[in-house]
Curated annotation (Swiss-Prot):
Keyword ATP-binding found: no
Any one of the GO CC terms: plasma membrane
Free-text function comment from the UniProt entry: Catalyzes the transfer of an acyl group from acyl-phosphate (acyl-PO(4)) to glycerol-3-phosphate (G3P) to form lysophosphatidic acid (LPA). This enzyme utilizes acyl-phosphate as fatty acyl donor, but not acyl-CoA or acyl-ACP.
Pathway: Lipid metabolism; phospholipid metabolism
Pfam families to which the protein is assigned, alphabetical: G3P_acyltransf
Protein name listed in UniProt: Glycerol-3-phosphate acyltransferase
Native species: Caulobacter vibrioides (strain NA1000 / CB15N) (Caulobacter crescentus)
Enzyme class: transferase
Keywords from the named record: Cell inner membrane, Cell membrane, Lipid biosynthesis, Lipid metabolism, Membrane, Phospholipid biosynthesis, Phospholipid metabolism, Transferase, Transmembrane, Transmembrane helix
Swiss-Prot/TrEMBL catalytic activity: an acyl phosphate + sn-glycerol 3-phosphate = a 1-acyl-sn-glycero-3-phosphate + phosphate
Domain of life according to the entry: Bacteria
Membrane topology: Multi-pass membrane protein
Family: Belongs to the PlsY family.
Coiled coil spans: none
Amino acid sequence: MQDLAAIAYLTLGIAIVGGYLLGSIPFGLIATRLGGAGDIRQIGSGNIGATNVLRSGRKDLAAITLLGDAGKGVVAVLLARYLTNGNPAIIALAGGSAFLGHLFPVWLKFKGGKGVATFYGVLLSAAWPVGVAAGATWLAMAFLFRISSLAALTAAVLAAPFALAFDQPYPFMGLCLFMAVLIFIRHRENIARLLKGEEPKIGKKKPAEEAPPAPDAP
């Protein structure tokens, strides 16, 4: 019995710590540095996520960042599923740990991204119908309004109802709520700009980032 308990605790520790360390990998920073685009923390909003990497003008690096940030959520969930034979509580903890790792990466003094790509990676690997529904929501909102943050916030709000509709286990529903709350907290500045009608459209720079107008000719 003691051996079984030790194995269970070890498995839990691997799922949580492993998920967090995976989530902490700053793909945006790695991609921009290796790709010659500089330090992403000094570009645009300073965020390490794919949306800000796109502001560097490098769509290839933004795509790499998106895949990497989503992929670490996928790997964390699949690892937990393999280790526990599909235990929904451990899977939710591993996915949540990867998500927290992206938001608060140990390698960057706990200053990370907003978690949207990792959120989708966790959803797709833990319950793919929910991930597809949330992704479709993002695409629809982005197409209609051309505002990335609004699309992400809408998808986050609807993730738990989607989980309920697809009859997912309670730990996964709790994970959806947990991630949605943190996504809203991390997007508080975006929400303030949305309320003022100042949130930039997809592909547009923030007003503060735009070059000042040229002076009139004498």
